[in-house]
Amino acid sequence: MANLFTATAPFLSLSKPFTKTASYHQCYASSSNPPEPESSSPPPPPPPPQPLASQQKRKKNVETTDWVASSLTRRFGIGAGLAWAGFLAFGVISEQIKTRIEVSQEVANTRDVEEEKEIVLPNGIRYYDQRVGGGATPRAGDLVVIDLKGQVQGTGQVFVDTFGTKDKKKMKPLALVVGSKPYSKGLCEGIDYVLRSMKAGGKRRVIVPPSLGFGVDGAELESGLQIPPNASLEYIVEIDRVSIAPA
Protein backbone atom coordinates (compact mmCIF):
# COMPACT_ATOMS: atom_id res chain seq x y z
CA MET A 1 0.00 0.00 0.00
CA ALA A 2 2.79 2.35 0.84
CA ASN A 3 4.27 1.87 -2.64
CA LEU A 4 0.98 2.68 -4.27
CA PHE A 5 0.66 5.99 -2.40
CA THR A 6 4.29 6.78 -3.10
CA ALA A 7 3.86 6.16 -6.84
CA THR A 8 0.85 8.29 -7.12
CA ALA A 9 2.37 11.27 -5.41
CA PRO A 10 4.49 12.40 -8.40
CA PHE A 11 1.48 11.97 -10.69
CA LEU A 12 -0.69 14.11 -8.49
CA SER A 13 2.04 16.76 -8.20
CA LEU A 14 2.01 17.37 -12.00
CA SER A 15 -0.93 19.71 -11.65
CA LYS A 16 1.10 22.22 -9.68
CA PRO A 17 3.93 22.67 -12.24
CA PHE A 18 1.34 22.92 -15.02
CA THR A 19 -0.32 25.74 -13.18
CA LYS A 20 2.97 27.54 -12.72
CA THR A 21 3.75 27.22 -16.43
CA ALA A 22 0.43 28.72 -17.38
CA SER A 23 0.93 31.57 -14.94
CA TYR A 24 4.39 32.18 -16.36
CA HIS A 25 3.03 32.58 -19.91
CA GLN A 26 0.32 34.87 -18.71
CA CYS A 27 2.83 37.03 -16.89
CA TYR A 28 5.12 37.09 -19.91
CA ALA A 29 2.31 38.15 -22.22
CA SER A 30 1.23 40.78 -19.77
CA SER A 31 4.75 42.14 -19.31
CA SER A 32 5.43 42.32 -23.08
CA ASN A 33 2.50 44.70 -23.63
CA PRO A 34 2.33 46.94 -20.60
CA PRO A 35 -0.68 49.27 -20.42
CA GLU A 36 -0.08 52.81 -21.66
CA PRO A 37 0.03 55.37 -18.90
CA GLU A 38 -2.86 57.78 -18.86
CA SER A 39 -2.05 61.31 -20.00
CA SER A 40 -1.92 63.77 -17.20
CA SER A 41 -2.54 66.82 -19.44
CA PRO A 42 -6.21 67.77 -19.86
CA PRO A 43 -7.74 67.90 -23.39
CA PRO A 44 -7.62 71.33 -25.09
CA PRO A 45 -10.75 73.43 -24.55
CA PRO A 46 -13.10 73.85 -27.55
CA PRO A 47 -12.70 77.12 -29.52
CA PRO A 48 -15.01 79.89 -28.35
CA PRO A 49 -18.00 80.63 -30.62
CA GLN A 50 -17.53 83.50 -33.06
CA PRO A 51 -19.27 86.68 -31.90
CA LEU A 52 -22.46 87.48 -33.77
CA ALA A 53 -21.25 90.97 -34.59
CA SER A 54 -18.16 89.55 -36.33
CA GLN A 55 -20.30 87.15 -38.36
CA GLN A 56 -22.61 89.95 -39.42
CA LYS A 57 -19.64 92.14 -40.38
CA ARG A 58 -18.17 89.39 -42.57
CA LYS A 59 -21.53 88.83 -44.26
CA LYS A 60 -21.89 92.54 -44.87
CA ASN A 61 -18.45 92.72 -46.50
CA VAL A 62 -19.36 89.91 -48.91
CA GLU A 63 -22.62 91.55 -49.85
CA THR A 64 -21.06 94.95 -50.42
CA THR A 65 -18.31 93.57 -52.67
CA ASP A 66 -20.70 91.44 -54.76
CA TRP A 67 -22.83 94.23 -56.22
CA VAL A 68 -21.64 93.42 -59.74
CA ALA A 69 -23.15 89.91 -59.56
CA SER A 70 -26.38 91.38 -58.18
CA SER A 71 -26.53 93.92 -60.98
CA LEU A 72 -25.94 91.26 -63.63
CA THR A 73 -28.55 88.98 -62.06
CA ARG A 74 -31.17 91.73 -62.15
CA ARG A 75 -30.39 92.62 -65.75
CA PHE A 76 -29.64 89.30 -67.43
CA GLY A 77 -30.95 86.67 -65.02
CA ILE A 78 -29.31 84.31 -62.60
CA GLY A 79 -27.04 82.85 -65.30
CA ALA A 80 -25.07 86.07 -65.69
CA GLY A 81 -24.80 86.48 -61.94
CA LEU A 82 -23.52 82.94 -61.56
CA ALA A 83 -21.05 83.52 -64.39
CA TRP A 84 -19.60 86.50 -62.55
CA ALA A 85 -19.45 84.51 -59.31
CA GLY A 86 -17.70 81.72 -61.20
CA PHE A 87 -15.11 84.14 -62.55
CA LEU A 88 -14.45 85.31 -59.01
CA ALA A 89 -14.19 81.77 -57.67
CA PHE A 90 -11.62 80.64 -60.25
CA GLY A 91 -9.64 83.88 -60.25
CA VAL A 92 -9.91 84.62 -63.96
CA ILE A 93 -10.88 88.24 -63.54
CA SER A 94 -8.11 90.22 -65.12
CA GLU A 95 -8.03 92.87 -62.41
CA GLN A 96 -7.38 90.24 -59.75
CA ILE A 97 -4.64 88.32 -61.52
CA LYS A 98 -2.66 91.27 -62.81
CA THR A 99 0.81 91.69 -61.46
CA ARG A 100 2.13 95.01 -60.30
CA ILE A 101 4.14 95.30 -63.50
CA GLU A 102 1.04 94.84 -65.65
CA VAL A 103 -0.89 97.41 -63.66
CA SER A 104 1.96 99.91 -63.90
CA GLN A 105 2.18 99.31 -67.65
CA GLU A 106 -1.55 99.94 -68.02
CA VAL A 107 -1.26 103.20 -66.11
CA ALA A 108 1.80 104.22 -68.10
CA ASN A 109 0.01 103.56 -71.39
CA THR A 110 -3.06 105.58 -70.37
CA ARG A 111 -2.82 109.18 -71.51
CA ASP A 112 -5.04 112.23 -71.67
CA VAL A 113 -5.82 113.69 -75.07
CA GLU A 114 -4.70 117.30 -75.37
CA GLU A 115 -6.98 118.13 -78.29
CA GLU A 116 -10.19 116.23 -78.97
CA LYS A 117 -10.64 115.10 -82.55
CA GLU A 118 -13.96 114.06 -84.00
CA ILE A 119 -14.20 110.52 -85.35
CA VAL A 120 -17.24 109.74 -87.50
CA LEU A 121 -18.16 106.08 -87.97
CA PRO A 122 -20.11 104.70 -90.97
CA ASN A 123 -23.12 103.94 -88.74
CA GLY A 124 -23.48 107.62 -87.78
CA ILE A 125 -21.80 107.53 -84.36
CA ARG A 126 -19.44 110.41 -83.60
CA TYR A 127 -16.97 110.30 -80.75
CA TYR A 128 -14.13 112.30 -79.20
CA ASP A 129 -11.45 110.61 -77.13
CA GLN A 130 -10.71 112.44 -73.88
CA ARG A 131 -8.40 109.78 -72.48
CA VAL A 132 -6.85 106.82 -74.29
CA GLY A 133 -6.78 103.74 -72.09
CA GLY A 134 -3.83 101.41 -71.71
CA GLY A 135 -5.66 98.26 -70.60
CA ALA A 136 -7.58 95.45 -72.29
CA THR A 137 -10.11 95.99 -75.07
CA PRO A 138 -13.50 94.40 -74.31
CA ARG A 139 -14.92 91.82 -76.67
CA ALA A 140 -18.31 90.16 -76.95
CA GLY A 141 -18.99 88.16 -73.79
CA ASP A 142 -16.56 90.10 -71.59
CA LEU A 143 -17.72 91.72 -68.38
CA VAL A 144 -17.08 95.44 -68.17
CA VAL A 145 -17.62 98.03 -65.46
CA ILE A 146 -18.17 101.56 -66.71
CA ASP A 147 -18.99 105.05 -65.52
CA LEU A 148 -21.60 106.70 -67.71
CA LYS A 149 -23.32 110.03 -68.13
CA GLY A 150 -26.05 110.37 -70.73
CA GLN A 151 -28.20 113.30 -71.79
CA VAL A 152 -30.59 114.16 -74.57
CA GLN A 153 -28.78 116.30 -77.10
CA GLY A 154 -30.44 119.67 -77.56
CA THR A 155 -32.39 119.70 -74.28
CA GLY A 156 -29.56 118.71 -71.94
CA GLN A 157 -31.87 116.39 -69.99
CA VAL A 158 -29.62 114.02 -67.99
CA PHE A 159 -31.05 110.50 -67.75
CA VAL A 160 -28.08 108.63 -66.26
CA ASP A 161 -24.99 109.77 -64.34
CA THR A 162 -22.64 107.52 -62.37
CA PHE A 163 -19.85 110.11 -62.21
CA GLY A 164 -21.74 112.10 -59.59
CA THR A 165 -21.72 115.79 -58.76
CA LYS A 166 -21.55 117.88 -55.63
CA ASP A 167 -25.34 118.21 -55.59
CA LYS A 168 -26.11 114.60 -56.44
CA LYS A 169 -25.02 111.40 -54.75
CA LYS A 170 -22.81 109.27 -56.97
CA MET A 171 -24.44 106.17 -58.41
CA LYS A 172 -22.61 102.87 -58.55
CA PRO A 173 -20.79 102.15 -61.83
CA LEU A 174 -22.70 100.02 -64.31
CA ALA A 175 -21.78 96.41 -65.04
CA LEU A 176 -22.70 94.78 -68.33
CA VAL A 177 -21.80 91.88 -70.58
CA VAL A 178 -20.66 93.19 -73.95
CA GLY A 179 -23.09 92.19 -76.68
CA SER A 180 -25.92 91.21 -74.32
CA LYS A 181 -29.45 92.55 -74.59
CA PRO A 182 -31.81 94.04 -73.53
CA TYR A 183 -30.20 97.31 -72.54
CA SER A 184 -31.19 99.14 -69.38
CA LYS A 185 -30.25 102.07 -67.13
CA GLY A 186 -29.79 104.42 -70.08
CA LEU A 187 -27.51 102.10 -72.06
CA CYS A 188 -28.17 101.64 -75.76
CA GLU A 189 -26.80 99.82 -78.79
CA GLY A 190 -24.56 102.74 -79.69
CA ILE A 191 -22.67 102.55 -76.38
CA ASP A 192 -22.28 98.78 -76.70
CA TYR A 193 -20.76 99.35 -80.14
CA VAL A 194 -18.36 102.08 -78.97
CA LEU A 195 -17.05 100.08 -76.02
CA ARG A 196 -15.48 97.53 -78.38
CA SER A 197 -13.00 100.09 -79.72
CA MET A 198 -11.98 101.43 -76.29
CA LYS A 199 -9.53 100.14 -73.68
CA ALA A 200 -9.69 99.91 -69.91
CA GLY A 201 -8.91 103.32 -68.46
CA GLY A 202 -10.19 105.14 -71.55
CA LYS A 203 -12.76 107.93 -71.53
CA ARG A 204 -14.78 109.08 -74.52
CA ARG A 205 -17.53 111.55 -75.45
CA VAL A 206 -20.01 109.91 -77.79
CA ILE A 207 -22.90 111.22 -79.92
CA VAL A 208 -25.36 108.42 -80.71
CA PRO A 209 -27.92 108.85 -83.53
CA PRO A 210 -31.57 107.85 -82.89
CA SER A 211 -31.18 104.66 -84.93
CA LEU A 212 -28.65 103.31 -82.40
CA GLY A 213 -30.31 104.97 -79.42
CA PHE A 214 -33.99 104.61 -78.55
CA GLY A 215 -35.33 105.04 -82.08
CA VAL A 216 -38.57 106.56 -83.30
CA ASP A 217 -40.52 105.46 -80.22
CA GLY A 218 -38.25 106.87 -77.54
CA ALA A 219 -38.20 105.11 -74.18
CA GLU A 220 -39.29 105.29 -70.57
CA LEU A 221 -36.41 104.39 -68.25
CA GLU A 222 -36.56 102.60 -64.91
CA SER A 223 -36.14 105.96 -63.17
CA GLY A 224 -39.32 107.24 -64.83
CA LEU A 225 -37.51 109.64 -67.16
CA GLN A 226 -38.77 109.85 -70.73
CA ILE A 227 -36.48 109.78 -73.76
CA PRO A 228 -38.32 111.57 -76.59
CA PRO A 229 -38.71 109.94 -80.01
CA ASN A 230 -35.93 110.41 -82.57
CA ALA A 231 -33.58 111.82 -79.94
CA SER A 232 -29.84 112.01 -80.47
CA LEU A 233 -27.99 111.13 -77.28
CA GLU A 234 -24.74 112.49 -75.89
CA TYR A 235 -22.71 110.32 -73.54
CA ILE A 236 -19.53 110.44 -71.52
CA VAL A 237 -18.32 106.87 -71.01
CA GLU A 238 -15.28 105.64 -69.08
CA ILE A 239 -14.19 102.00 -68.80
CA ASP A 240 -13.18 101.22 -65.24
CA ARG A 241 -12.47 97.52 -65.63
CA VAL A 242 -12.51 94.75 -68.23
CA SER A 243 -12.85 91.15 -67.08
CA ILE A 244 -12.05 88.89 -70.00
CA ALA A 245 -14.29 85.85 -70.23
CA PRO A 246 -12.48 82.46 -70.12
CA ALA A 247 -11.96 80.76 -73.47
Swiss-Prot record:
This protein's GO CC annotations: chloroplast; chloroplast thylakoid lumen; chloroplast thylakoid membrane; nucleus
Protein name stated in the entry: Peptidyl-prolyl cis-trans isomerase FKBP17-2, chloroplastic
Stated role: PPIases accelerate the folding of proteins. It catalyzes the cis-trans isomerization of proline imidic peptide bonds in oligopeptides.
Family of the protein in this entry: Belongs to the FKBP-type PPIase family.
Region described as Disordered: spans on this chain: 26-64
Reaction it catalyzes: [protein]-peptidylproline (omega=180) = [protein]-peptidylproline (omega=0)
Subcellular location field: Plastid, Chloroplast thylakoid lumen
Enzyme Commission number(s) of this protein: 5.2.1.8
PROSITE patterns: FKBP_PPIASE
Record gene name: FKBP17-2
Biased composition (Pro residues): 34-51
SUPFAM superfamilies noted in UniProt: FKBP-like
Main localization of the protein described in the UniProt heading: plastid
GO molecular function, one term: peptidyl-prolyl cis-trans isomerase activity
